């Protein structure tokens, strides 16, 4: 038996659909409004776009998928804090090693290319 305060999946799905539609309409209103009011100041239009997009994101955040996305973002931020980032010295050393290996490989490939060009020229008699 379900609790009285729990939403049924159908009503939740319908509410989410309506919220996504409202978020889309708000975002579309930002784009269309920016186009239609092109003669107004850029600052006013930018403020309108920011407000409408913020409202669209706010509405989208109240949906089931929006709440899941916010939860995922919070968990991701916690994981980023756990990462042990390299020091500046380690980063510079690794970068210099990659640069040196890239230069050596470029010289090796250039040499092989030169040898192959000479072999083809020798074989074709050019």
From Swiss-Prot:
It comes from the Bacteria. InterPro entries: SecE_bac (IPR005807), SecE_sf (IPR038379), Translocase_SecE/Sec61-g (IPR001901). It is found in: Cell inner membrane. The chain crosses the membrane at residues 20-40, 42-62, 97-117. It is a multi-pass membrane protein. PROSITE patterns: SECE_SEC61G (PS01067). Keywords: Cell inner membrane, Cell membrane, Membrane, Protein transport, Translocation, Transmembrane, Transmembrane helix, Transport. It holds the Pfam family SecE. GO terms for molecular function: protein transmembrane transporter activity. GO terms for cellular component: plasma membrane. One of its GO terms (biological process) is protein targeting. Belongs to the SecE/SEC61-gamma family. HAMAP family: SecE (MF_00422). Component of the Sec protein translocase complex. Heterotrimer consisting of SecY, SecE and SecG subunits. The heterotrimers can form oligomers, although 1 heterotrimer is thought to be able to translocate proteins. Interacts with the ribosome. Interacts with SecDF, and other proteins may be involved. Interacts with SecA. NCBIfam families: PRK05740.1-2 (NF004372), secE_bact (TIGR00964). Essential subunit of the Sec protein translocation channel SecYEG. Clamps together the 2 halves of SecY. May contact the channel plug during translocation. This is Protein translocase subunit SecE. It comes from Vibrio alginolyticus.
């Amino acid at each position: 038996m379900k609790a009285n305060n729990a939403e049924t999946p159908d009503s939740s799905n319908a509410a989410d659909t309506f919220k996504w539609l409202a978020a889309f309409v708000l975002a579309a209103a930002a784009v269309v409004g920016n186009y239609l009011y092109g003669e107004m100041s850029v600052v006013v239009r930018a403020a309108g776009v920011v407000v409408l997009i913020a409202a669209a994101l706010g509405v989208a955040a109240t949906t089931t998928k929006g709440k899941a996305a916010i939860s995922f973002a919070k968990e991701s931020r916690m994981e980023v804090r756990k990462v042990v980032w390299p020091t500046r010295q380690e980063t510079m050393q690794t970068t210099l090693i990659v640069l040196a290996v890239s230069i050596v490989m470029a010289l090796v490939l250039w040499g092989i290319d030169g040898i192959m060009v000479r072999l083809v020229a020798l074989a074709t008699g050019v």
